[in-house]
């Protein structure tokens, strides 16, 4: 049996990125194509993208991308969100099934605004309030992980090669004025199991 390191390079690393200097939005398929040329620099254990300007219709709201282990955890997290934010829209993040990306958690997206009364009572500015809420979810709700929480941007990450992750998340259906991509070992992606436990 081959062991890790004989099949993949555990310390693989690949990066790519670009920005539209004139602000025009570029289809996400371009960043997927760009990082695919770095395939041999990745190890298949983690890939991700960040797109900026991808949610123009919700550009003034925070876009939370969240992994869940179960629907029970999702419901618990949504109660927390309802207490601390006005939820403008929520949905599963659209994916394209592929045999190259497996064992995915539940993946949801929320467009939210912090409740003004909560910000006032916290005596924090808006960004600090949002950051603390994200940290609270990630540290205190077991089985939930907020992996993206900015305005008019989104992170898309998974266990796999970057080009497969881009296909999985259907990045060809997004447009943004800036894109980054990486391929590497997923050192900070709780919520996604490489192998399903039986």
Each language-model region and where it sits:
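N-terminal segments that mediate ammonia production and transfer
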Residues: 1-198
């Amino acid at each position: 049996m081959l062991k890790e390191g004989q099949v993949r390079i555990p310390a693989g690393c690949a990066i790519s990125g670009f920005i539209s200097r004139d602000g025009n939005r570029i289809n996400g398929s371009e960043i997927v194509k760009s990082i695919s040329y770095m395939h041999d620099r990745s190890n298949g254990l983690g890939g991700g993208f960040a797109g900026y300007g991808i949610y123009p219709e919700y550009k003034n709201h925070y876009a939370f991308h969240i992994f869940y282990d179960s629907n029970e955890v999702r419901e618990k997290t949504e109660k927390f969100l309802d207490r601390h934010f006005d939820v403008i829209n929520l949905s599963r993040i659209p994916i394209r099934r592929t045999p190259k990306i497996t064992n995915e958690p539940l993946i949801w997206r929320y467009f939210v605004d912090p409740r003004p009364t909560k910000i006032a009572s916290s005596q924090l500015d808006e960004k600090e309030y949002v950051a603390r809420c994200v940290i609270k979810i990630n540290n205190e709700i077991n089985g939930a992980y907020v992996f993206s929480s900015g305005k008019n941007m989104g992170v898309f990450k998974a266990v796999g090669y970057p080009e497969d992750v881009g296909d999985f998340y259907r990045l060809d259906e997004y447009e943004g004025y800036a894109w980054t991509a990486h391929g590497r070992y997923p050192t900070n992606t709780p919520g996604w199991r490489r192998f399903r436990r039986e």
